[in-house]
UniProtKB/Swiss-Prot annotation:
Superkingdom as given in the UniProt entry: Viruses
One annotated Gene Ontology cellular component of this protein: host cell endoplasmic reticulum membrane
Keyword Kinase recorded: no
Entry keyword Transport: yes
TM ranges: 5-27
Gene Ontology biological-process entries: transport of virus in host, cell to cell
Alphabetized UniProt keyword annotations: Host endoplasmic reticulum, Host membrane, Membrane, Transmembrane, Transmembrane helix, Transport, Viral movement protein
Protein name as catalogued: Movement protein TGBp3
Organism in which the protein naturally occurs: Poplar mosaic virus (isolate ATCC Pv275)
UniProt similarity note: Belongs to the Tymovirales TGBp3 protein family.
Length: 71
């Protein structure tokens, strides 16, 4: 039979390693988030983007979506 001491010596390091790997994945994912531009009928939402001069020029051309019939 397994003793409690042996189980804790095996399980605790495995849990610590798995938790560390999961946390590193979350942190690296957050640092590599992509740029999202959401255009709706009311607003333009820009998230996670690097505001380079080229991106700023692009962002200046954005307009909200107008779905009304134009005569």
């Amino acid at each position: 039979m397994w003793s409690d001491s042996l189980v804790s010596r095996i399980c605790v390091p495995i849990i610590v390693v798995c938790t560390s790997i999961a946390l590193l994945n979350v942190v690296s994912f957050r640092s590599e988030c992509s740029c999202v531009v959401h255009i709706s009928g009311a607003a333009i939402d820009i998230r996670g983007c690097s505001f380079t001069p080229d991106f700023i020029e692009y962002a200046k051309t954005l307009r909200v979506f107008n779905h009304r019939y134009q005569e």
